[in-house]
Each structure stands twice: as C-alpha cells, then as structure tokens.
UniProtKB/Swiss-Prot annotation:
GO biological process assignments: spermidine transmembrane transport; spermine transmembrane transport; transmembrane transport
Primary residence: membrane
Organism: Schizosaccharomyces pombe (strain 972 / ATCC 24843) (Fission yeast)
GO cellular component terms, A-Z: plasma membrane
Record-given protein name: Uncharacterized MFS-type transporter C947.06c
InterPro entries: MFS (IPR011701), MFS_dom (IPR020846), MFS_trans_sf (IPR036259)
Record-annotated membrane-spanning stretches: 93-113, 123-143, 153-173, 180-200, 214-234, 288-308, 327-347, 368-388, 393-413, 427-449, 461-481
C-alpha cells in the first residue's frame, strides 16, 4: 500500500515537472518568432509596393466614393423652392437639409477615424457609406419635415467616413514624394462632387415644382453603383490589417495558433477613444498654429459652399437665369479648382526636392509660399464676381471671377492641409480631424444666411462683405512663414498634447 502511495507521488511529481518543462519550452521562444510582419521594405504585399495600376484603381475608387458623398452634400441645394412648395416652411428651413448633411460630416472624423484603424480602410469606409445610402433613401421616402432633417443629418454623419478616412488611403498607397500629387487628384474628386451636385439636381427637377425627391434617388443610384464597384475591386490598404489577415490565414493553414500580427494585440478602449479622437483634436484647436490655419481653411471652405448654394440665386437676381442654366457658373468654379491644382502639382515637385535636400524631414513653412503668391486670387475673384455680376455686363466676367475664386480656394485649402500634416506628422489624424470639424461647421452654417445677405445687401455689397473678410485673412500664411518655427518651439501646449 505504501509502495503504491510512493509510486503515485513520484508519478505526480514527474507529471508536474514535465508540464513545467513543456511550458518553459513553449514560452522560451521570442515573441518575434510568432509575429507576422512584411518581408522587408520590398515585400510585394506592402501597399507601397503594389503595381501602379492597382494603386491608381484604388485611388480612383476611393475618390469616386468621396465624390458621391460630396455630391450628396449639395444635391438638395437647388430644391429649396420645391420644399417650400411641398411643405408649409420658409426658405431658412428649406435650406437646412443641405446644412445638416454638412454638419453631420463635421462629427464623422471623431467616430470613423478609430473605426478604420481597428477594422481597416475598406470596412471603415464602405460600411458607413452603405449606411449613408440607407439614410438618403430614408430622406427620399420621408413624408414629414422632421424626418427629412433627421435622415439628412445621419446621411452626412456616415458620409464623413469616405470624406475623412479615404485620405488615409493615399498615405497607405503612395510614398511621400508621390503622395502630394495623389492627394491633389483626390481633392479634385472632393471639390468636383460638391460642384456638380447642384447641376445634376437642377436637371432632374427642372420640369416639376414638387420633384424634390428625384435628386435624392439619382444620388442613391450613383452611390449604389460606386459601392458595388468598391466591394469587388477595392483592396485593403491599411498595413496592420493586411498583416492581421495574413496571420489569420497562416494560423489556419499551419495550425500554429501562436502566429499573430501586432494589430491583433491592439484594443481601442473607451479612454483611448475619448483621449485620442475626441479630446485631442479640440485641444489642438487651442494652439495658435492649428487655430489660425484651420480658421483660414474653414473660411474659404465655407465660402465655397456659400457660393455653390447661392450662385443660382445671384444670377437669377442679375440676369434672370433660371433652372439648370443658373447652375452652370459652377463649372467655372471647377475650372478654377483645376488651375489651382496645377499650381499645387508644380509646387509639390519643388517641395519634393527640398525634402530630399533636408534628409527626408518635412519643411512645413515651405508649404506656404504658394499660398502667399496665389492665395490673393480668392478675395480678388470674389470682388470680380460681385461687381461684374450685373445685367449690362457679359456673363463671362463673373465667370472669370468665380474661376479665380476656385483657383485661390484650392491653393489655400490644400496648402493649409499640407501645412498641418507636416507640422504634426505623428498626430496628423488629429490635426486633420480638427480641421475637418471646423470647416464643416463653416460650410454647414454659411448657406443659412447667404441668400438673406444677398437679398438685403445686393450682389455687389453682399459679395464685397465676404471678400473683405477673406482679404483680412491673406496675411496668415505670411505670418506663419516668418514665425511658424518659433511658435512651434515656444508653445508648451503643443508638447503637452503631442
């Protein structure tokens, strides 16, 4: 009996020792042996090394998705009179569907930036885009003013995902020397969507005073077509998620359950969400650099939407243009944007050489000379538009003014964005979120008073008021060109939030 007890004791000890040996052996391997990474900088699975054709396809598809989201932002601007005819509301209420959509976009970065970082660009953009389509269908099917307003806000909120997160795709796909040009072409999609929305909308509503739903169904069809292309043709571009998917496939094929990617260990908790994505963007607005640059970019963005939503009204006042013809000046705006984009592309080539000479380190202040040289076109164009928009002056004159506005707008807007990214490289997402929030607030509120302003002051002085404020902001890039580096080094608050 004692011998059996002794044998049992020995067996138990040996088993425990064996378990300890196995455990020690199992955990003695370094974590790097189980960590899935890219196979060097030249790994073909890395998005930066994809064929140019694949990069261009993904850039174009994300650009089209953003085009549709921006198209939706202005698609209801020509339908204000139709809403007044359909419901017992005034003009101020009828313009709210456009404003609420843009205000919804203002809050998108706070939600969808972390969502795309956890789930990847494709899911992080396409799922909210699909939900935006559903809410747009809800607007088109609404029978009450309250339902229209509510669904428009949420359509804009979810549309904030492609508007904001798609920019990160450019960073995934293109190296720094190419990224500036890629971002310019991407920005063309952003602005052209807002430009062409009213034109198409006025076409489909021209022959009916109550057909305010038709533009919404039109954009739903366009968005569904683009979403279908996205689902089948877009590839995931976010490196950490690509590696997590690769690790999952390797675990299934090798049965080695220890294989994992660094992204598998990432968990976004509530505290991190609040600190990084809610508090930091607003905290950054308290710094002089972010505040004044964001205000400059936001004001010109607000002017863009002010012009886009009131151009038909102003040309109706001065030249009695009605329907689709009253929206054609928006083509002049897009022409100006293309010209401004050409300036940006040429300057980016010089900037790339400066970065190379500086050892690859960003030079934020070198983003500003183009704004200093061309930014004056924005206020100058506003004055030309305002004072040549008269019955006795040929229409080409205000069109030239609108094109000047478009060129100046694009140079300022893109320059401000690039300056913030170069200044806060590590926390560029927060800087962009702060900029997106403020610009959407401006764009969402300017249309509320624009028509009333032109009605009370007239086209000449109403436009001049906007132009004088824009003129007062022209010194901003000059100030930061001379003092930007000094402000960054002396501002303790920047160090605190970064």
């Amino acid at each position: 009996m004692k011998e059996n007890d002794h044998l049992n004791s020995v067996s138990s000890s040996e088993i425990e020792k064996c378990d300890e040996d196995v455990e020690e052996e199992l955990y003695s391997y370094p974590d790097s042996d189980f960590l899935v990474t890219f196979n060097g900088e030249d790994d073909p699975e890395k998005p930066l090394n994809w064929p140019v054709s694949i990069k261009l396809l993904n850039t174009a598809l994300y650009g089209l998705t953003t085009f549709a989201a921006q198209f939706n932002s202005t698609t209801m601007s020509p339908t204000t009179s139709h809403l007044v005819n359909a419901y017992p509301i005034g003009h101020e209420v009828a313009v709210l569907p456009t404003c609420l959509y843009i205000l919804g976009i203002a809050f998108g970065p706070m939600i969808f930036a972390p969502f795309s970082e956890v789930n990847g660009r494709k899911i992080g953009v396409l799922v909210p885009f699909f939900l935006s389509i559903l809410f747009t269908i809800g607007t088109a099917s609404s029978d009450s003013v309250a339902a229209i307003m509510c669904t428009r806000f949420f359509a804009g909120l979810f549309a904030g995902a492609p508007v904001v997160s798609s920019g990160g795709v450019m960073a995934d796909l293109w190296c720094p020397a190419q990224r500036g040009t890629a971002l310019i072409f991407y920005a063309f999609f952003v602005v052209s969507g807002a430009d062409f929305g009213p034109i198409i909308s006025s076409l489909v509503t021209e022959h009916s005073d109550t057909a305010w739903r038709w533009p919404l169904w039109t954009i739903v069809i366009i968005e569904c077509f683009i979403l279908t292309l996205d689902v089948f043709l877009i590839k995931e571009t976010f490196g950490p998620v690509i590696l997590a998917t690769k690790a999952k496939n390797l675990r299934l094929t090798t049965k080695n359950w220890g294989l994992h990617a660094a992204h598998d260990e990432y968990r976004l908790d509530f505290k991190e969400f609040v600190t990084l994505h809610l508090v930091r963007p607003f905290a950054m607005l308290a710094t002089p650099i972010v505040f004044f640059i964001a205000m400059f970019a936001s004001y010109v963005y607000g002017i863009l939407y002010l012009v886009l939503t009131t151009i038909p009204y102003t040309f109706g006042m001065t030249k009695n243009w009605q329907g689709t013809i009253s929206t054609l000046p928006m083509i002049a705006m897009f022409t100006g944007v293309v010209i401004g984009g050409s300036f940006n592309i040429m300057w980016n080539q010089r900037y790339a050489k400066l970065i190379t000479a500086n050892g690859g380190k960003p030079l934020p202040e070198q983003r500003l000379p183009l704004m200093m040289a061309v930014g004056w076109l924005m206020p100058a164009g506003i004055f030309v538009f305002a004072w040549t928009n008269s019955p006795n002056i040929h229409w080409i004159a205000p069109f030239i003014g609108i094109s000047m506005m478009g060129a100046g707008f694009f140079v300022i807007f893109q320059g401000c964005l690039n300056y913030l990214v170069d200044t806060f490289t590590k926390f560029a997402a927060s800087a962009i979120a702060a900029n997106t929030f403020t610009r959407s607030i401006f764009a969402g509120t300017f249309p509320l008073f624009s028509e009333i302003m032109f009605k009370k002051l007239g086209v000449h002085w109403g436009g001049s008021l906007v132009g004088f404020i824009a003129l007062g902001m022209i010194p901003i890039p000059f100030i930061f060109y001379m003092m930007g580096d000094k402000l960054r080094r002396k501002n303790r608050f920047i160090k605190l939030i970064t």
